[in-house]
Amino acid sequence: MRTRCNVIEGLCILVIGLICALASPAGAQAPTAGPVQAWGLPPLPAGVGPVEKFADVSGTPQGQFLEGGSFDTQGNLWFVAIGSGWISHLTPEGKLVPVVNCNPPPEFGQTCEPQGSRWFEGKLYLTSRHRGILIYDPQTKELKTLVYTWRNQLFKGPNDLDFDAEGNLFFTDPWGTGPGPNMSDQTGAVYQYARDGMLRKVMDSGAFPNGIAVSPDDTLLAVGDFRAGRLWYGTFQNGPNMGCPQCPKDPSHSTFAGVKAGTFMPGNGGPDGIHYDVKGNLWVASPPLGGVLEINPRGVVLGFVPIPNDDGATTNFAFGGPDNQYIYFEGAISGTFWRFKAPYPGLIGPGGVRLPAQP
């Protein structure tokens, strides 16, 4: 009886196997995942062109740890060197043009250490770890300080900056890179220097707020927290504050209806410089990962573009080039610049002009 049962069971298994084989298309294989890069990073984003070298400033004072990145109206890529204090630009052909050094005279004993850069209304705005927010006027060649203290205390080390559509300036101030008030307060902050000249602290938490960008629809402030390895999104309070009916409306973008935690970086990659494209995708530079990530408006990582020379410090980048659709990103340690064509144009165009958002 047991032998007969075994025969019947075997026939059943054989029949089921034949049915499954007939139901499958000829040559069909089990689905496989797409190629995965080092550290489990996603593949290249769709629509990305090949990466090519744009310039090499290694071995020069202007190439000592690259940061910043912004295009003027003539197509020049401006950048800074943290290690030497130089503010320079590359011509559209990739030729290096040193412009000005922001280090004070040696007798003052303090370096500048510039970080972020952004053009706005014909002037270059910069963050400096030790000198606060600087403005360079290309017409007069003057470099001056806009603001360097909050309530009579030095900033902790201003890092990056962006403007909203109304012309309000936002900048991050992480603890640990600049003079800093004291060791007991190791949190960072985000400030707004409003169009009317008022300085406000709009965020006072976060381990190390770094990159910062205002969304294409001017409703969100994205902040990259380098130490926490994630992004934060603050929704601007434009209309009535439902939690405070007696409070006035806030068209100046100085308060938030809410702040929420966003995407964690894959591979423990802390976010550095961040920029939106016109579709609302957020592009994020990550020094630990050595490249840039594309994240869609829902917070999903769409892909990763590595820097070709394995430079472990992709600090920042800028949209520019033909149709403002090329990303120029930096190898901070190697002193090299690379570029590739992105799927969509960047939100910030030449001279810091915000381009129209696309649905």
Residue ranges and their predicted role:
Residues I82, R129, P174-G176, F226, ...:
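Short loop/turn segments immediately following the C-termini of beta-strands
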Residues Q29-E52:
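Blade/loop signatures of beta-propeller domains
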Residues W78-C102:
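Beta-propeller domains
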Residues G234-P248, K341-I348:
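Short loop/turn segments immediately following beta-strands, especially the blade-tip
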Residues S58-N76, P104-H130, R151-L169, W175, ...:
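Beta-rich, blade/repeat-based domains predominating
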Residues W86-S88, G132-L134, G188-Y191, R230-W232, ...:
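A short loop-to-beta-strand structural motif that recurs across blades of beta-propeller domains
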Residues E52-A55, V97-N103, K144-Y148, K201-D204, ...:
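Beta-propeller fold detector
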Residues G10-A21:
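Bacterial N-terminal signal peptides
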